[in-house]
Amino acid sequence: MARLALLSVSDKSGIVELAQRLVNEFQFDLISSGGTAKTLKEAGVPVTKVSDYTGAPEILGGRVKTLHPRIHGGILARRDLPSDQADLEANDIRPLDLVVVNLYPFEQTIAKPGVTVAEAVEQIDIGGPAMIRATAKNFAHTTVLTNPNQYEAYLQALQEQGEIPLALRQQFAGEAFALTNAYDQAIANYFSGLSGDSANQFGLSGTLRQPLRYGENPHQSAGWYQTGREATGWAKAEKLQGKELSYNNLVDLEAARRIINEFDVREPAAVILKHTNPCGVALAPTLVEAYQKAFNADATSAFGGIVALNQPLDGPTAAAMVKTFLECIVAPGCDAEAQEILAKKNNLRVLILPDLATGPSQTIKAIAGGFLVQSADDEREDPSTWQVVTEKQPSGEELAELAFAWKVCKHVKSNAITITKNKTTLGVGAGQMNRVGSVEIALKQAGTEAQGACLASDAFFPFDDSVRTAAAAGITTIIQPGGSMRDQDSIQAANELGLVMIFTGVRHFLH
């Protein structure tokens, strides 16, 4: 008797080629449902519709197709158990040798802007996971394929050995259970997130995309995992050139992506970053000017840095970049002239990520015995809600500068201070255990350029010492969240010293 395979896939990549080889080279009979059967018939592949095989029509608009004893009996039957074989014969059920199934694109659906719950629900697969789990459970007797990347390995084993080795069937089963686990977890997370509250159950699942040489340090092992079936985010980035990405590269690139995403793509912006902290950020009329301003903000720290741009990389900007050693560059595009220039630095990693705006909606940190989950700090603030708390009012130009400094400060490790002028960072005080210490570091970097500059603080000033220190160096405008028991002391000092100070009402700790 010919072997029997069931094919029912949402992702139809390679399915026609697989079906043709199963029929022509290995004499399989095929059964299929819905769109897959239609695709195979149109390609001239002989196939029997599931409804014809089971004798039961597809019902409820296609919600019930494969949930039938002739399908699941054929999947779950143990070939070495006489009672199972007797049941198959009594019910005219053929054993299934191969089940090829992938699932409705639930994650891709919920990622679309404005998707409704009803639309999401229709992409929750029922029959697919049931068949996948059943086949994976019975891997001792049958094979499940859940990814087009598996097709060639299956066909090669069949060609070379005439059957699928147990170890390979077991491997496919493990991958199948990982898929259904991730799928169910995505659905659970979606429904938990609808309420906006912390879920009672939260899971994270990923597929190893790339083993990394090591983690933050050479003695630490690491891997890069991709969430979802389809590549998104950095997994979708195109690497034009350069060495393999490291763990630290990816961490820094994500930090750079978050900062560059703060700025409107209509105004050229450049970010240079080291160890997840920006050392230079600038806006300018042209991209090359923005990069040069960001570089000059702290040329020493820029050596070996990560650069992010909000506009496609052009020749003049690339020419400026190759004058120093950089680890990585990411931009939404890159023209031919820039590629030719950058190619001279063959170790320089250059990535194209058109969608720099899309990032994770949550952040997760491991702790002993569990992990912490929080929503991402990515909400856009409305400056009209900010409060000027000093007697002196900011000009329109000063308000724009304060907004720029505030956007950068949000992405500096706490305690965070940024000093800016002309939409360019002059000094960055990061990660100090006391706020005035971060102020002093930022002022030291800014030097005499602090005269007439703007200062941003990611959290309130517990005392007025930071205000007085800033004013003594020439700072004229300050932006901070407010919220200290001693806010009035800082306001009084600002008024006394003739400063402008704004309270945003939003804190941006970053640990």
Swiss-Prot record:
The keyword Iron does not apply. Pathway: Purine metabolism; IMP biosynthesis via de novo pathway; 5-formamido-1-(5-phospho-D-ribosyl)imidazole-4-carboxamide from 5-amino-1-(5-phospho-D-ribosyl)imidazole-4-carboxamide (10-formyl THF route): step 1/1; Purine metabolism; IMP biosynthesis via de novo pathway; IMP from 5-formamido-1-(5-phospho-D-ribosyl)imidazole-4-carboxamide: step 1/1. Signal peptide: none annotated. Its EC number is 2.1.2.3, 3.5.4.10. It comes from the Bacteria. Gene3D superfamilies: 3.40.140.20, Methylglyoxal synthase-like domain (3.40.50.1380). Residues 1-146 form the MGS-like domain. Pfam families: AICARFT_IMPCHas (PF01808), MGS (PF02142). GO terms for molecular function: IMP cyclohydrolase activity; phosphoribosylaminoimidazolecarboxamide formyltransferase activity. Belongs to the PurH family. This is Bifunctional purine biosynthesis protein PurH. It comes from Synechocystis sp. (strain ATCC 27184 / PCC 6803 / Kazusa).
